[in-house]
Amino acid sequence: AAANTYRKIFDHFTPDKLIGFTATPNRGDKVRLDTVFSKIIFQRDLRWGIEHGYLCDIFCRRVNIGYDLSHVRTQRGDYAPGELEEAMEGTADAIAQAYRELATGATLIFAVSVHHAEEIAKRIPGAVVVTGETKDRAAIIKAFTAGEIPCIVNCMVFTEGTDIPRVETV
């Protein structure tokens, strides 16, 4: 709602009351939602969602895929894209190996670039790459949801507002 596209809609229609719902209140661009909404009237946290069955429990494993971010600069609170891609060069084999050893069921993998996504997907049988340029995204999600695709490797697509209940491993 804090994005310019939404703000233009709000400005155009000038609603008397504006109510917002979000599962991702902490935006990547650091724009605060209180610039759009004056107060929070109801909220639940991650723990509440898990305890009440709205979200699945979390099981985390740290996997060493052989990267070094010590020389990667940050820009506006995120890693510099070109530098991050360079730092992640050569990690596709380790990511595919971690997938084979640890993934349970439908898997969603996040890559740092389109090239990185393609390199990872090449190493995972049946994996499909989804990027901002993917034309048949809805068909891919439908096939993934139906169990026809075991793994989606994406680059900057499934970051906010994604709801694919079949995903078991990220």
Task: Name each model-derived stretch.
Residues 164-170:
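TOPRIM-like Mg2+-dependent DNA-processing core and adjacent phosphate-binding/basic surface
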Residues 10-15, 54, 100-102, 143-146, ...:
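Conserved catalytic network of the ASCE P-loop NTPase/AAA+ motor domain
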Residues 15, 23-28, 48, 64-69, ...:
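Conserved nucleotide-binding/hydrolysis micro-motifs of P-loop NTPases
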Residues 40-111:
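Conserved interdomain linker/interface between the two RecA-like ATPase lobes of SF2 helicase motors
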Residues 2-60:
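Post-DEXD/H (motif II) to motif III coupling segment of the RecA-like Helicase ATP-binding lobe
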Residues 17, 150-151, 169:
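Short, Asp-centered acidic motifs that coordinate Mg2+ and/or phosphate
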Residues 6-11, 96, 121, 141:
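Short amphipathic alpha-helical segments and helix-helix/interface helices
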Residues 108-110, 116-121, 125-162:
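Conserved helicase ATPase core of P-loop NTP-dependent helicases/translocases
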